[in-house]
Structure formats: structure tokens, C-alpha cells
């Protein structure tokens, strides 16, 4: 419903792609909840006033946990604690340490989050936090791929509109100055962008349908086959659509020449926003 939102708290200053190095800890409380203590960085939508509560999914270590990724557990830590009747209660011991000043995606608050002995509840089994967190990863991979596709499409639409309006140069067989879309290399650039965009959109729709089949189809064999396809396609989508999406976005900027480098047309923002994906 959007009344509450969520944040995934994995990365730490010393633990990026190697999450086995994370130092955030969780110790049990008598009531069955946990006290979570540590600091995380690069937390997308870690805090904001667009929802009445933010639910943090935090990776942490419990006492006597094995070293490395095999000793990581997952905890649900709400920004605002919830009373027994479902109403919002006291503020949890979660605070923003800093806001990251980013190259792009300025509309999204990316935060350093401090968990100062906050109250949390374990999700799943002890020391199985990564497995629990990765149940969301296929959907997240698809969403990131769509991010690359969407920005490339926006850049392509702007480039096409500009190429139809911008009068520059001449071509054989036509008199007077022509729109730059009449030049072969500009058309090649626009068509290359559109080829990627249409193929990527088809790949996204196919994979999204497979995700629905994996979850909802009544036939177990169909669900299993769809799940195998999803496991294969989602990493490809995340990698390919973001890389090619950035290249297409830059190509759209190039169509505008110098105008693509200034803010008036918006292409420079698309390039900055596409880079994060």
C-alpha cells in the first residue's frame, strides 16, 4: 500500500561485495527480540518522510556465529516500533549518520544508517541471513535491469525528438538544411538504441511472466521450469540491460551534441542516473 516502506541494510564501510567481513552485531533479549548494533552505508531510502514507517532488513552477526558469510543472520528493525494493537509507538534506536551526495538519482535518499542498540526480530533461521535476503534478489535484479532500460528509453525519446527538429547540414538529393535525422550516422545511432530498447523490453516482459508462473501456476512442473528460467535470466538482465542501457543513454546524449551536455534537455541527468544501475 505504500503506507510503510522498506530498506535493505547490507553494506558496511569495510564490507562491500565481501559481506563476510561485516561487523554489525545482534544479541538476544529476554522477550525473544534482539538488540542490533552497527553502522551501514549506501542504504537506499534508509530514511525519509514519505511514509510513516521504514522497515529495515539488517544483516548482522549473533554471538558465537561462524566466520564469514555462514555466520550472518537477518533482522527486521522498524524505524518506529509497533504497539500490540498495530499502532505506531516509540521511535526505535535507528538514526541517519549522513546523507550521501551522489552523482545521480538525487530524488532517492541514500543514507549512512546507525543502529544504536535498536530492537529487531530475526527473520528466518540463525546464520541463514543471506539465504533469506536472497529470496528477494531475483525481483531486485529484474528491477535494476528495468532501471537501465527505462533511462535508456527516456534518453532515446529525447534524442529522437531533437533529431527531428534540429536543422544542420545537407544531404545528397535534398536542397537546403535538413533535420539531423536525415544523416545516416544519426539514424544508425537512433536505430541501434531502439533495437536495444525493444529487445530489452521483450526480455523483461518474458522474465516477469516466468516469475508469475513460478509463483502462481497450478502445475508444479511448470513452476519448477519457470523458476529455473528465472534463475538463469535475472542475472543476465541485471548485467546486460544496465551495461547496454548506459551505453544507449550516452548515445542519446551524443545525438544532441553540445546540447546533450547541458541541463536544458535533460540528457546529462539521464546519463548520471543510468550510471548507478
List each language-model region with its residue ranges.
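A glycine-rich, basic-preceded beta-loop-alpha segment at the flavin cofactor/substrate interface
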Residues: 42, 81-97, 102, 109-140, ...
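C-terminal helix-coil-helix/basic helical segment that borders enzyme active sites and/or dimer interfaces
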Residues: 198-240, 253
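Extended amphipathic alpha-helical segments enriched in small hydrophobics
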Residues: 141-218
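Glycine- and acidic
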Residues: 5-9, 37-43, 53, 93-98, ...
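Internal maturation/activation junctions in enzymes
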Residues: 1-24, 28-29, 208-223, 227, ...
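Active-site-adjacent bridging/hinge elements
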Residues: 33-36, 121-134, 164-180, 208, ...
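Glycine-rich phosphate/cofactor-binding loops in nucleotide/flavin-utilizing enzymes
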Residues: 259-277
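A short core secondary-structure module
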Residues: 33, 37-91
